[in-house]
Swiss-Prot record:
Full protein name: Glucose-6-phosphate isomerase
Catalyzed reactions per annotation: alpha-D-glucose 6-phosphate = beta-D-fructose 6-phosphate
Gene3D superfamilies, A to Z: Glucose-6-phosphate isomerase like protein, domain 1 (3.40.50.10490)
Gene Ontology MF term list: carbohydrate derivative binding; glucose-6-phosphate isomerase activity; monosaccharide binding
Residues annotated as catalytic: 322, 351, 455
Keywords: Cytoplasm, Gluconeogenesis, Glycolysis, Isomerase
One BP annotation, GO: glucose 6-phosphate metabolic process
E.C. number(s) listed in UniProt: 5.3.1.9
UniProt-annotated location(s): Cytoplasm
Function: Catalyzes the reversible isomerization of glucose-6-phosphate to fructose-6-phosphate.
Family membership: Belongs to the GPI family.
Amino acid sequence: MTERELWERYQRYLCVVPALDFTLDVSRMRFPADYLERMRPRLEEAFGAMEALEKGAVANPDEKRKVGHYWLRAPELAPEPALQKEITDTVAAIHAFAKNVHEGRVKPQKAQRFTHMLIVGIGGSALGPQLVADALGTAKDPMQVSFFDNTDPDGFDRVLAQLGERLSETLTLVISKSGGTKETRNGMLEAERGYSARGLDFSKHAVAVTGAGSELDNHAKKQGWLRAFPMWDWVGGRTSVTSAVGLLPARLQGLDIDALLKGARDMDAATRERDALKNPAALLALMWHYAGDGRGHKDMVILPYKDRLLLMSRYLQQLVMESLGKETDLDGQVVNQGIAVYGNKGSTDQHAYVQQLREGVLNFFATFIEVLKDRDGGSQEVEPGVTSGDYLLGFLLGTRRALYEKDRESLTLTVPDVSARTLGALIALYERAVGFYATLVHINAYHQPGVEAGKKAAGVVLELQRKLTTRLREARAEARTAEQLAADIGMPDEVETVFKVLQHLAANPDRGVTRTPGATPTQARFQAK
């Protein structure tokens, strides 16, 4: 197409959300002229499914659960008055608690005020709060934020070392919907150890966000933690940013959670429009479907041209891939659905993997995120009449053009700024696009059986390790190979796992296992110290 023809296509297919000053440009997607009309019946089904979900229908049939994250920013949509009250009461409680913390009425054991926050969580209990904290945070926030978002011992040590003496001024939020997530449990115990090493009572610095009656909830009450805030079974971890999971840390950080909720609410309202060209979430879902033939054949590359949106691709990895990566459809047929997501930020990407995007394997479509506002205040000129922000836009438009010249398709999402309201709207936009796409391809977007399978497999490994350590203690004087030890514990077919576990134990001197090299690495012998 000529530049003039592309301009005409841009105008024809530009989706505008006036209330939010958002636009979605799909002109660089090469869908045929009749595509949107052909997809209309399936899109109508998606609109119907979303409407039923918002009214309280069971939208997660595998777990027989309602899906209510849209109620969090519009409590009046919740199907029961009691739920409406719980939602509004929780937001009010978050505001009140944060105010008491900031004003020193809720204070640490041996300091005048909480100045830092440590968030212990994983998956949706960390990725959403991390995105919000990084996108909206400033050096002037009343509380600075750190995270335990894994079960990596060295990671725990690094964060605790960075906090140092400020741990006495640190409020720890332990976030787990089920209350039994092992990574989060481990992080909590490591945090307790850190506080104890400094002569501090962890319970006087701890808050829980969890389901009522969960293992974590009961532990927090028994230990006398400062407070517990609720998570509900109708809110999934990856869609929990507008629940206490995201709102409590954001409010404690000093961010405008009312604006975050309003942005999400306004985007929800805009994406109830049944004309795809006026509904950015529906149009996104259709473009994903077109790009990958409804089978996820192309990856989604997220290119935000703004440092504050660096974590957007990580957040969307979970939201999109955990929601859409499913083996079977709603009828139980094997479909192996999903869309792979990756990205970084522009223009850093231009000096990293854009080379392959333009000239390598054509297995992706790109999403550019353009932010109109450069910064608070004015910008200096780096060249006559040109600012650094002008360069950023130039690189975005230049990369978009360079990709299109090589038949690489892209979407461009334009937002006014990176504010709480805009971020709330972006989060809601992708939540709803995922919901629409799931209906288009007939899958359940709201469960994650593959995650549970991984947890069960990890449990098997740890049970094997317990058997191994018991056997090593019994045969203290005798060094044995992985093959021999696997046979000793009655698991000869698990010899590779046995070898990996022994290798790990021997590499850590405090674990009580020594390794004697063999002719090959796998012939090494292990024994208890």
